Amino acid sequence: MAEKRRFKKRTCKYCEQKVTFIDYKDIELIKHSLSERYKIMPRRLTGNCKKHQVMVEEAIKRARHAALVPYIVDRKRVIPNPFEELQPIYK
């Protein structure tokens, strides 16, 4: 019989950095939870804990409402990394 594969347990990167609040204006922090089409990625792919996943989802939804992140992206014009064009706010 084939042996079961052992998967490495993912750790929440927000817990590692001891993030207590995820702000919707901090695009650099929430961009890791968005796909190339600006969809919210699930917990099983990002490795976020439930508390931080809820905070990320709320921040992304608020950023969409404030027009900082688009709701949808045209399928014909998908770019590999949408955040390459953004200049860092903080230096």
Curated annotation (Swiss-Prot):
The keyword RNA-binding applies. SUPFAM superfamilies: Ribosomal protein S18 (SSF46911). It comes from the Bacteria. InterPro entries: Ribosomal_bS18, Ribosomal_bS18_CS, Ribosomal_bS18_sf. One of its GO terms (cellular component) is cytosolic small ribosomal subunit. One of its GO terms (molecular function) is small ribosomal subunit rRNA binding. Gene3D superfamilies: Ribosomal protein S18. GO terms for biological process: translation. Pfam families: Ribosomal_S18. Keywords: Ribonucleoprotein, Ribosomal protein, RNA-binding, rRNA-binding. Coiled coil: none annotated. Belongs to the bacterial ribosomal protein bS18 family. Binds as a heterodimer with protein bS6 to the central domain of the 16S rRNA, where it helps stabilize the platform of the 30S subunit. Part of the 30S ribosomal subunit. Forms a tight heterodimer with protein bS6. This is Small ribosomal subunit protein bS18. It comes from Nitratiruptor sp. (strain SB155-2). The gene is rpsR.
